[in-house]
Amino acid sequence: MPCSRRQGMFFEPNILQVGSKLCYPDRYSSGHGFYSGSAAHPEVEGANVTGIEEVVIPKKKTWDKVAILQALASTVHRDSTAAPYVFQDDPYLIPTSSVESHSFLLAKKSGENAAKFIINSYPKYFQKDIAEPHIPCLMPEYFEPQIEDVSEAALQERIKLRKVKASVDMFDQLLQAGTTVSLETTNSLLDLLCYYGNQEPSANYNFQQREQSEELEEATEADNEKSKTKAGHHLGVTWRTKNNAERIFALMPEKNAHSYCTMIRGMVKHQAPTQALNLYTVLLNNRLRADVYTFNSLIEATALVVNEKFEEKWNNILDLLKQMVTQNVKPNLQTFNTILKCLRRFYAFGKLPALQTLREMKAIGIEPSLATYHYVIQLFYQHESPSKGSSLIIYDIMNEVMGKRFSPRDPDDDMFFQSAMRVCSSLRDLELAYQVHGLLNTGDNWKLIGSDHRRNFYYSKFFNLLCFMEQIDVTLKWYKDLIPSVFFPHSQTMIDLLQALDVANRLDMVPQIWKDSKEYGHTFRNELKEEILMLMARDQHPPELQVAFADCAADIKSTYESQDARQTAPEWPASSLNYVAVLFLRAGRTQEAWKMLGLFRKHNKIPRAELLNEFLDSAKASSSPAQAIELVKLASAFSLPVCEGLTRRVMAEFTLTQEQREALGELTALTSDSSSDSDSDSDSDISEGK
């Protein structure tokens, strides 16, 4: 059913109406509309008086500093024949495959990190500021403390420089000297310790955090508890009891809400949910209030507690939301996204609470982000191949977001397009995939497609769906538009395209696809080569096409030979040997075809009966009884059942000398003896079994 003509399941007016079971009584107040209407134009007094012209001065508009550049950029479209923009600075480093693309991106990032390290290690050599206006990020950063005496100012400086160990040492020295550290400075120290888990941050800490979150996300999608644990402990940052943060927190003479909230958030971040919930109880006993960010962490901690049923966890989350109302804490987008993110762990039980959460967001006027819809998609489509009727919620989501322009509001916003296209591919819904792709190309939404890995996943799924569902001419247009300017195809992508060409009877494109495959680094992909050879050798084709197929087969044959020379690799597959020999025969390249028979013996592969009959036809066409006898010898060497039939054909269709007839007779006798021996062996095996 087309998406644009359907009514939504959870975006219907009767579901969007304010009446959910969550806990915000102020949602009925005005000013919380989901959409903000455009302001009416002011009426100018006297403007309707005949003969009087009134000038309406528009309100001042502040333009962005790069507004002109943005306007110019909007007039230029992507060049489908060029390499991705990120590689155009250095033509030597333009990749030709997905592996090279990933390697070059890592190399570029490594070079940036090396340059930053040199600049920050030797700042005195990089003092000249050539940028106008001044660009702070291009200048060296000073990471060494300048205040050497033991004072609170020195502690504040070390905290600002994110020196974890030095900050703790300075704090201890101040306590030993009898100096009282202010509550504000102590809270700043707790912030530092809780954020980095009592460990010294590395130079690429933010990059590592992002990698860890992606591993946890993939582990959640795979529902693999072991992989979740491994990803969670990947960096070795876990909350340990009696660490420096807990010690300093216990030494504080006075604590405010900020102190408790920092500790709670640090415990949740570093996998200590039970301790965080216990500390929240202490906060309530001291008649303090938590902020919205702490409640977000507590919601996550509630879902992480083990040995509790899903219903108990959901009730605990509802209790936290009620406490937010009691403490006059207004939820934000991350509150609801955290709830939806946790509900993914509840499987089928989480579907109804997820719908309630979405209704509540609309009721209090919080616009969902792309991450919100990503969590809903993951919850309702947890299986790799959902049935068409399992859930229609993806259609409601697309009805809601079509035509909208999104900006990043959540760290997981860049995962929506990947999950949406995965569902489109699973449902085999091409129209829905076009809608998702249209949303991606709306405004600057393309910036939210994510990393290089996510972009390749998205376009691979999209192109796979095109190959299965779209007409071949349209598919080829997409092929030229997307590859390689947007992404580099995997070997499976090329196989999908070959199968689409087969269905559309466009096998004349196969040699070009092989040429492209070599450019994209798939020269030694055996599955791809066997697919190409099978399509070319399966049926007879016009002579011109057979010549092109034979040239392609010769090129593929050279890859097997060069592969054996360059590395230890599997031998020729029997199917590939058969296909190449057939293609050579059909193109009239008889000499090369007969050489292929020697490869069967060399690699100890058995030729097919159909291939041997085609070879016999070729020998008959060239009136060569010697080749026919060699063919019978090959069949006899492998004790093939077709040997007897080949012998009869040679005796009947060729003019043989007496010597050749005797040789054929000997081959026939040897074949019959070997077959009788095998029959007797099988009979003895049967009798022993009885």
Feature locations, PLM:
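A basic, Ser/Thr-enriched alpha-helical scaffold prevalent
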Residues: 1-690
